[in-house]
Amino acid sequence: MRVKEQLLTLRAYVPGKNIEEVKREYGLSKIVKLASNENPFGCSARVTEALTSLASQYALYPDGYAFELRTKIAEHLGVKAEQLLFGSGLDEVIQMISRALLHEGTNVVMANPTFSQYHHHAVIEGAEVREVSLKDGIHDLDAMLEQVDEKTKIVWICNPNNPTGTYVEKQKLLSFLESVPKSALVIMDEAYYEYAEAEDYPQTLPLLEKYENLMVLRTFSKAYGLAAFRIGYAIGDAKLIGQLEVARLPFNTSTVAQSVALAALEDQAFLQDCVQKNAEGLNQYYAFCKEYNVFYYPSQTNFIFLKLGIPGNEAFERLMKKGYIVRSGAAFGIDDGIRITVGLKEENDEIIELLKELVNEQVQKEETYS
């Protein structure tokens, strides 16, 4: 029995190391995980309240259409309910879209590096992947447009981008949308949308009416702090969304996930508090980078990508031995960088002290050999 040939060229997704794994491996009692861009402040207290009322529903199938959540999100965003497609996290939404649109003879266009699942599912479906290197850490939309042809089914734009935290400006996006063929679906993955505060960050939902080939992805895993429950969604042209529903598994979002998402959505005060504290945390890292002349990408997310002057894998290992889990840039093809999730203030302070040690050691080595 053999699987598709293209599956043999891929690896299963490898998430960041989990806390218990690192405790066992290094014999540590305290671990701070700053690797997976989770919300360090947790989730709204209303989520806990919602969970207590669900015990009587565990034996029942969930609402496959997610009617109540669909209605509330549509109202919150100012879109129509039939414009929404729900998935077990954005990973499943990406899988559904790829499954429905891609096949051998088609192609997708994306940046490199960016979120790996765009590439992963395109390969599984037999599509050609056309990757365009980031320019100064940002999507090079002009170069991406040059890669689009009549066989291009999807253009992926992760905005803000993972792993760099950078963003595409409004005017550049508008110019791209005016130029790209209507036969290509432009998907804006806005998993980190709530954290983006730049004045020229594009507000894409008002553009959906004009551009039928535009789709937007959002999630409850990041700023809302519901990563464990796996729920994300797409917003797009109602006709296309209806066609994509055919590729959706029955009952793909659980009753629990729908209920906690509803509860989280209703607590916008908690969300805004998290966003504010995240901005303060980013400023801690910016201050360190400027003082120690460390390269970094200004971030519109809850993480920062920086370069310490040593290999990312080395920084990753040394920080992990101290009880701090980050992501090595090698995982994204940037061997000399690391990605760090913004944590609690004291967590940021602690890891920044470790980063200072790494930088100082590297400076001393360079002085010794100079």
UniProtKB/Swiss-Prot annotation:
The protein's Enzyme Commission number: 2.6.1.9
InterPro entries for the chain: Aminotrans_II_pyridoxalP_BS, Aminotransferase_I/II_large, HisP_aminotrans, HistidinolP_aminotransfase, PyrdxlP-dep_Trfase, PyrdxlP-dep_Trfase_major, PyrdxlP-dep_Trfase_small
Keyword annotations of the record: Amino-acid biosynthesis, Aminotransferase, Histidine biosynthesis, Pyridoxal phosphate, Transferase
Keyword Transferase applies: yes
CDD domains: AAT_like
GO molecular function annotation: histidinol-phosphate transaminase activity; pyridoxal phosphate binding
Residues found modified as N6-(pyridoxal phosphate)lysine: 222
A GO biological process held by the record: L-histidine biosynthetic process
Listed pathway(s): Amino-acid biosynthesis; L-histidine biosynthesis; L-histidine from 5-phospho-alpha-D-ribose 1-diphosphate: step 7/9
EC class name: transferase
Cofactors named for this entry: pyridoxal 5'-phosphate
Catalysed reactions listed for this entry: L-histidinol phosphate + 2-oxoglutarate = 3-(imidazol-4-yl)-2-oxopropyl phosphate + L-glutamate
Family annotation (NCBIfam families): hisC
Subunit structure: Homodimer.
Entry similarity comment: Belongs to the class-II pyridoxal-phosphate-dependent aminotransferase family. Histidinol-phosphate aminotransferase subfamily.
Name the record gives this protein: Histidinol-phosphate aminotransferase 1
Organism: Bacillus cereus (strain ATCC 14579 / DSM 31 / CCUG 7414 / JCM 2152 / NBRC 15305 / NCIMB 9373 / NCTC 2599 / NRRL B-3711)
Gene name tied to this protein: hisC1
